[in-house]
Amino acid sequence: MSQGSQHFCGNRTDWPAPILPITDMDKSLEPEWLVKQCTNLRTDWLVLDGYQFDQAYRQSLHSNKFKFAVFDDMNNSGALFADMVINGAQNAGLNGYQLTAPKALLAIGRDYQVLRQEFLQLTNLKWSERNNLTIMFGASDPTKLTLLTLQSLHNVNASMPITIITGAAYEGLHELTDLIKNCNLHITHHHDCQDMASVLVNTKLAISAAGGSQFELLACATPSILVVVADNQKNASQDAASQGWCQLVYSDDLSADELVMQCLSLWQQPELLHSMHKKALQLPVVDGALNIVKLMSENITASNNL
């Protein structure tokens, strides 16, 4: 992985694997380097996850020396050249992967949602012990929704305990710290949080970017307002909203003040929040990573028996 990714993963207390660093090189040379590493290490599967990897990059990774899997959200970036496509959204079957990866194994749907182990070992989901409003807008929050939402909560003198979570790539720490110091709200701030599950199981309502964190919120049965900030978040988030445990809004359609008004309205309806919590509890928490590995292993075994 790149130097930036190494820094992020190296700070994780739950990172289990050795890291193979990619030295500084032209991006066009990366696929050849990766293929060489996989061949030398006798790798069974190479898994690619990232929006920056285009069709040409993926094509260069396709090899008869190892299998190639890609994580995907929308199937909107051309041919995938993959032996396996992974998409944990329940409605991923509508994406038309038969056109862009006609020979690929499809690890798609809720059975393949990937969660860290902390979300598979939850012990306390008691509703009566939840008190906090949690605000989290992903690893970097490029549109500064954390600041805008917190400022709006300050303007209306919100009274509930508030937890702010910022990701490792968040660049507004100085400004956020100043705002927290200068407002009179009851705020706890976690930066690069290492134990998200313990925070979310104590959350009564979350305002969250509608990315992969929605699967973590669901696992913790946390009622949520999911804010769509990117097109690739729409499909999975619409499916989540249909399940009844969250509400869905689009960042382009409302201001931070309007978002906070919706939040306060929901907060003042404890029976509705409890109902959303119970609907989340009815949905199974699946070890999607284990199911993916099983599918990969079965495929390798079948290939070796040919």
Regions found by a protein language model. Give the residues of each.
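A short, well-ordered alpha-helix in the C-terminal region of glycosyltransferases
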Residues: 265, 272-286
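Donor-nucleotide binding loops and adjacent catalytic segments primarily
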Residues: 128-202
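Acidic donor-binding loop of glycosyltransferase active sites
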Residues: 201-212
